[in-house]
Regions:
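Short, hinge-like loop/turn segments at secondary-structure boundaries
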Residues: 8-9, 67-68, 186-188
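Short loop segments at secondary-structure junctions
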Residues: 13, 119, 208-210
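FAD-binding subdomain of flavoenzyme oxidoreductases
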Residues: 15-169
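Residue-level preference for short coil/turn positions at secondary-structure junctions
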Residues: 6, 22, 138, 198-199
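Ser/Thr-glycine-rich phosphate-binding loops at phosphate-binding pockets of nucleotides
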Residues: 33, 239-240
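C-terminal substrate-recognition/cap domain of FAD-linked oxidoreductases
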Residues: 130-134, 140-238
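Single conserved hydrophobic/aromatic residue that forms the stacking wall/gate
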Residues: 1-12, 238-239
């Protein structure tokens, strides 16, 4: 639906327009800081899963314009996957009103997906209706040392099979990269000593569980134990 844009200027605001716990959606303006959206969802007992290092300063509009991925993309997808509807100012100075919380919409062209990731070249996103999810009851995280990328791929395959949808994070980092961080920022240090600190590859593995802390721990330890026995992982540092 197109309607004329009234006024000669557009101001992108930062309000939360609506939060629907029945449909698990939140409608926010593009100037909203990502962290503020996360907190609004948390206050309603829900999770908005997009998370990245700049979440205290980046805006939802920027996340949408770049189709940001974040740390939990394995489970929840990119920003495009988290979006149900948009409000956009077009190049003609009109507002395209596609702010809908409809889960299944197979009518016509999907302009929403064209605008997301276009970095403002097709229009300026001014608001969005986003998906919310149940908050996890417990989570487990481990930093692992590995000898090769092949081992990392096999570990990821085992984690997917063992955790299913509960696998929320898997980040692979080279040892050279982490050593460079330590050199440039002497106040930082690796959590491993000796030969383990010189490992060629590190992986960060995360599980989020909807049942209980005990259930999360058991699943996590089972998959990780099997990976260690198979020689995929050399050393692990676990936080539960």
């Amino acid at each position: 639906m197109l309607r004329s844009l009234v006024g000669s200027e557009m101001c992108i605001r930062d309000r939360v327009r609506a939060l629907d716990t029945d449909n698990d959606t939140i409608t926010v303006e593009a100037g909203c800081i990502l962290q503020a959206v996360q907190e609004a969802a948390a206050n309603a007992g829900r999770l908005f899963p997009l998370s990245l290092a700049a979440e205290g300063s980046c805006t939802i509009g920027g996340n949408l314009a770049t189709n940001a991925g974040g740390t939990q993309v394995l489970r929840y997808g990119n920003t495009r996957d988290l979006t149900l509807g948009l409000e956009v100012v077009t190049a003609e100075g009109e507002i395209w009103d596609g702010l809908r919380g409809l889960r299944k919409d197979n009518t016509g062209y999907d302009l929403r997906d064209l605008y997301i990731g276009s970095e403002g070249t097709l229009g300026i996103i001014t608001a969005a209706t986003l998906k919310l999810f149940p908050r996890p009851v417990a989570s487990c995280t481990a930093l692992l040392t590995l000898d090769s990328i092949d081992n990392a791929v096999e570990l990821l395959s085992r984690a997917r099979a063992g955790f299913g949808a509960a696998l929320t994070g898997f980040e692979l980092m080279s040892g050279d990269c982490l050593q460079a961080v330590v050199r440039l920022f002497p106040q930082q240090r690796l959590p491993f000593d000796g030969e383990s600190a010189a490992s060629p590859w590190f992986a960060l593995l995360e599980l989020s569980d909807s049942e209980s802390e005990t259930h999360a721990r058991e699943r996590f330890e089972t998959v990780l134990g099997d990976a260690i026995e198979a020689g995929l992982v050399n050393l692990s540092l676990i936080h539960i």
